[in-house]
Amino acid sequence: MSGLVPIVVEQTNRGERAYDIYSRLLKDRIIFIGGPIDDHIANLVIAQFLFLEAEDPEKDIHLYINSPGGVVTAGLAIYDTMQYIKPAVSTICLGQAASMGSFLLAAGAPGKRYALPMARIMIHQPLGGVQGQATDIDIHAKEILRMKDLLNDRLAHHTGQPLEQITRDTERDYFMSAEEAKKYGLIDEVMPYRK
């Protein structure tokens, strides 16, 4: 059942047109990350960013995030694209933005980072594991520490928190409510319900 993607039908002056729900949202410049972030998801998100920039480089793009996180390099590819393209990228957390999901949430355009009231946000240090020869393990250990420093530096930049605070807080899983994430600087506003 999880593989089913709803189809929506739109009436136009030329007749009916059917879209899968994600294509319909893309028409409104909405991109959705709804699960773990891996290379496949990153490539899809990046392609959508580049397409929307080509369509209209002046109009905001809205990135909705409900993700437990994922592969650091895949998330950094999305991050780099968000920073590279001309349109402002607003980020909206619904459900959860954990690990790389919270990193992308914080990387939205200043003043345009949101979470719904019941959202949960979690930051922590990158996870990794490797096996093999001692030299290879040492190489990978140095790389994950370099990634940890890079992610902490970027989080400090986007949140306004001192690097020392970020380093302390990411030593272990650090969960926040939407309001706590706002105070921390991960988001700018908690979005009220529309009704």
Swiss-Prot record:
InterPro entries: ClpP, ClpP/crotonase-like_dom_sf, ClpP/TepA, ClpP_His_AS, ClpP_Ser_AS. The active site is at 99 (nucleophile), 124. SUPFAM superfamilies: ClpP/crotonase. Keywords: Cytoplasm, Hydrolase, Protease, Serine protease. Its main location: cytoplasm. One of its GO terms (cellular component) is cytoplasm. It comes from the Bacteria. Its EC number is 3.4.21.92. One of its GO terms (molecular function) is serine-type endopeptidase activity. GO terms for biological process: protein quality control for misfolded or incompletely synthesized proteins. PROSITE patterns: CLP_PROTEASE_HIS (PS00382), CLP_PROTEASE_SER (PS00381). It holds the Pfam family CLP_protease. It is found in: Cytoplasm. It catalyses: Hydrolysis of proteins to small peptides in the presence of ATP and magnesium. alpha-casein is the usual test substrate. In the absence of ATP, only oligopeptides shorter than five residues are hydrolyzed (such as succinyl-Leu-Tyr-|-NHMec, and Leu-Tyr-Leu-|-Tyr-Trp, in which cleavage of the -Tyr-|-Leu- and -Tyr-|-Trp bonds also occurs). Fourteen ClpP subunits assemble into 2 heptameric rings which stack back to back to give a disk-like structure with a central cavity, resembling the structure of eukaryotic proteasomes. Belongs to the peptidase S14 family. Cleaves peptides in various proteins in a process that requires ATP hydrolysis. Has a chymotrypsin-like activity. Plays a major role in the degradation of misfolded proteins. HAMAP family: ClpP (MF_00444). NCBIfam families: clpP (TIGR00493), PRK00277.1 (NF001368), PRK12553.1 (NF009205). This is ATP-dependent Clp protease proteolytic subunit. The lineage of its organism: Bacteria, Bacillati, Bacillota, Clostridia, Eubacteriales. The gene is clpP.
